[in-house]
């Protein structure tokens, strides 16, 4: 019985010693992150199809899709294209030395020219954030006018490349 009692006292002493010797301390540390202001842009092709001289203007659309950080104000501009001597009011598709005029607008009536000068002829919007369903889709309204200059061009395929710039 003494052996059992002695063993029990030793066990209690060890537990008591373990409890008395266990101490803790705590601290905190800050956790931070900065969400960067950011925008991503993509655009679909603008294909006018076939322009038949003397049959009226040809109208088509394209879409510029922009994702920007939530609450970020941005401007979307379209440059004059890659053809020398083109302007944002009269862009030019080329086929060799021949140039087919066209224009890009920001409204369905095709009266508001879409250019590349912030505060003058760009389109301003506010970002919805990133993720599914948050894209800001902007329609580009294109027109090949049935103008006198366009009516004297040879048949063929005419092309240009327009650069989209998002300023934020």
Feature annotation, model-predicted:
Residues 17-19:
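N-terminal signal peptide c-region/cleavage motif recognized by signal peptidases
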